[in-house]
Amino acid sequence: ADPVDYTGRRRLLRSLMNVRWPDEADPEYTRIQDELLKEAAEQKGIVEWGQLPTIGGQFPCETIKNVDKISLWRGDITRLSVDAIVNAANSQMLGCFVPGHGCIDNAIHSAAGIQLRNECAQIMEAQGHEEPTGKAKITKGYNLPARPRTVF
């Protein structure tokens, strides 16, 4: 797309966010980015947790507890307004640095904003080593519609 139209500008912003190393940003940049990402989230459509079918309704099973509280989602995870989402992050926990890449790590970091990469970098610096496979960290969701936090 032409970078002068909305779609082109959005792709360019995403690509620049993807290659940006974690670092503090000018507050005015962050404010503008947050406005744009919130508008983009609204345009995609936010899915509230109450709209999600539970596994109890889809797969009746008496051996699984809390089937009326567990949902499976197939779609754009960045649209969900839920308590937490889980990202298949890499061991550096900094997100995907490939511009416009279609992986879930890139999608989450692109929808959350540069603050997520910054927070992940701070967590990893304090930890002092890469994240072992199968472990997770809890971060804020920033511009994701996820309610209180996002799990990585």
Predicted segments with their positions:
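Macrodomain-like recognition of ADP-ribose-binding/processing modules
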Residues: 1-152
